[in-house]
């Protein structure tokens, strides 16, 4: 069989390598719209669940010289960090070892890398199995190929590009990111990407420059990253500063995010990122951390960044299906997520590994393999996709007193909409010990909703106590009418909020400030269908309570 992959980013190249391992395909062609590999971005984390998959495919994250004989970056040289440091506003530093640096044979440590280094690692491995290598099932990468249209029949998919050329395959995979053209062509009704109202600056500082950092008054930093091979985090009410080493400790990656709902440049379609003025960035952080003793350290880091860029953080509501006929999606095209879990690239790698196993299991039965892939991946990827949204919630205005009362009654944050570090349980094996190659030998049942990804320690009795004390409307709705999607779409604001869950329409307008998930739920899903993200969330007791907010049954538009 022949494979077409749209997008030669990290997910696309990894998936090409993974599909070779299935033994099912004769050739793999990857098409990329840019003429040269993209260089935008700074640091990222290949976590254990992604690193072990890289080792499986012979992708060397640790070796090599980041600058080859010609002086061009060719990948390698990850930074294997030792600890995380949370630097609090009171000056207290809590340090935790970075575990899951498992046995050397596993290859499953945390690898913090420059994005370009990782991309070049992937390109290097792909070249080793290219058309001139003489291997079975070669991978060929075609640059400068911008997708224009798709057409599929029972036995073939045809991709046509803007230069007039075309390609045919038995399978086509969209690995073309959050702005996926494959997604728009095949699923035109999918929700558009959404700016989260969080802006971040990214940049790199050479090691010698980090060592020389000083506060504005010339004194040393309170916590200079040069003193610790760690990932440092400084959270504030409306901002979050993080830094960690990449390229074997040669560069410090600096990442600073802040809540900026009025940043007009990210509300349209102008782009995802822009070059930034270091002085502007430094001033932003100076204001964000005003009155905070960590401000001098943060502004020093901001001012030292070389060629920083300004990024708008976008996501998209989960949608139910990732495949149609012989066409499938992976990575950010299927499940774009914010960077709070450090799992974006790792989930794309997991997609590729699962696809390989599904085709190894089902052979030339493309639709069955894609359905199996969707079933094993949708539920897990949705966990990260949804939860990463809420990990930025601390940058927004404080929760309502009513919601805080609910949390106090529960005595811990048991709901999936809460900041991930505050949830019950601390076992991270569900993230890092997971092996995406294990897809089972039978088609799994369909599951919706990312709701059980840590062990819950809250007792059933305590949960029942919380549910029984949820706020009730003075006049419950009757739920005895029919509602169209067009009507629901009219109620799409924070102050007039209807939401669809499993073909029922609920009015969250009065309920939102008292909802355990917080008013953020209303802001994200007003006027929309939230079934793909909430489908299996609510318990029977919660559903009994929701009846009081039910407008009626969803019907097709007239």
Predicted region positions:
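Extreme N-terminal starter segment of soluble prokaryotic enzymes
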Residues: 1-3
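A short, Lys/Arg-enriched amphipathic alpha-helix followed by its capping loop at the start of a domain
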Residues: 15-26, 53-56
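Glycine-rich FAD pyrophosphate-binding loop
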Residues: 20-42
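Conserved FAD-binding catalytic core of PHBH/FMO-like flavoproteins
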Residues: 85, 109, 120-303
């Amino acid at each position: 069989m022949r494979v077409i992959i749209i997008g030669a980013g990290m997910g696309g190249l990894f998936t090409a390598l993974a599909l070779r391992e299935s033994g099912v395909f004769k050739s793999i062609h990857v098409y990329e719209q840019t003429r040269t590999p993209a260089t935008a971005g700074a640091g990222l984390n290949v976590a254990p669940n992604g690193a072990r998959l890289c080792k499986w495919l012979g992708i060397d994250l640790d070796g090599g010289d980041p600058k080859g004989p010609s002086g061009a970056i060719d990948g390698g040289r990850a930074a294997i960090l030792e600890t995380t440091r949370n630097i609090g506003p009171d000056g207290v530093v809590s340090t935790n070892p970075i575990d899951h640096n498992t046995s050397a044979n596993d290859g499953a440590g945390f690898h913090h890398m420059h994005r370009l280094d990782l991309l070049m690692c992937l390109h290097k491995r792909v070249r080793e199995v290219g058309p001139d290598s003489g291997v079975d099932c070669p991978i060929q990468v075609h640059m400068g190929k911008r997708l224009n249209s798709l057409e599929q029949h029972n036995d073939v998919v045809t991709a046509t590009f803007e230069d007039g050329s075309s390609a045919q395959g038995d399978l086509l995979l969209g690995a073309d990111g959050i702005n996926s053209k494959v997604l728009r062509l095949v699923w035109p009704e999918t929700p558009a990407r959404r700016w989260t109202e969080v802006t971040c600056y990214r940049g790199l500082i050479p090691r010698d420059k980090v060592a020389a950092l000083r506060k504005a008054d010339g004194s040393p930093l309170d916590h200079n990253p040069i003193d610790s091979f760690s990932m440092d985090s400084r959270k504030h009410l409306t901002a979050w500063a993080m830094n960690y080493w990449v390229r074997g400790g040669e560069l410090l990656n600096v990442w600073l995010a802040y809540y900026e709902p009025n940043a007009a440049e990210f509300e349209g379609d102008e782009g995802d990122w822009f070059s930034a003025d270091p002085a502007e960035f430094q001033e932003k952080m100076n204001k964000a951390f005003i009155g905070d003793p960590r401000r001098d350290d943060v502004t020093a880091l901001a001012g030292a960044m070389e060629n920083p860029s300004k990024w708008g953080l976008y996501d998209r509501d989960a949608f139910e299906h990732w495949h149609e006929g012989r066409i499938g999606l992976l990575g950010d095209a299927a499940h774009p997520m914010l960077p709070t879990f450090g799992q974006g690239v790792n989930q794309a790698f997991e997609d590729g590994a699962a696809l390989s196993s599904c085709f190894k299991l089902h052979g030339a039965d493309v639709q069955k393999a894609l359905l199996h892939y969707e079933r094993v991946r949708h539920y897990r990827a949705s966990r990260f996709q949804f939860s990463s949204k809420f990990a930025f919630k601390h940058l927004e205005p404080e929760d309502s007193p009513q919601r805080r009362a609910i949390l106090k009654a529960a005595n811990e944050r048991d709901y999936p909409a809460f900041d991930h570090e505050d949830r019950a349980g601390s076992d991270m094996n569900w993230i890092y010990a997971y092996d995406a190659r294990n897809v089972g030998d039978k088609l799994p049942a369909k599951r919706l909703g990312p709701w059980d990804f840590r062990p819950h320690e809250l007792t059933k009795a305590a949960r029942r106590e919380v549910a029984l004390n949820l706020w009730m409307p003075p006049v419950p709705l009757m739920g005895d009418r029919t509602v169209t999607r067009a009507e629901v779409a009219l109620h799409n604001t924070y102050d007039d909020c209807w939401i669809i869950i499993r073909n029922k329409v609920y009015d969250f307008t009065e309920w939102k400030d008292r909802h355990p998930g917080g008013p953020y739920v209303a802001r994200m899903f007003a006027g929309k269908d939230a079934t793909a993200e909430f489908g299996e969330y609510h318990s029977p007791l919660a559903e009994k309570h929701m009846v009081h907010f039910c407008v009626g049954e969803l019907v097709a538009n007239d």
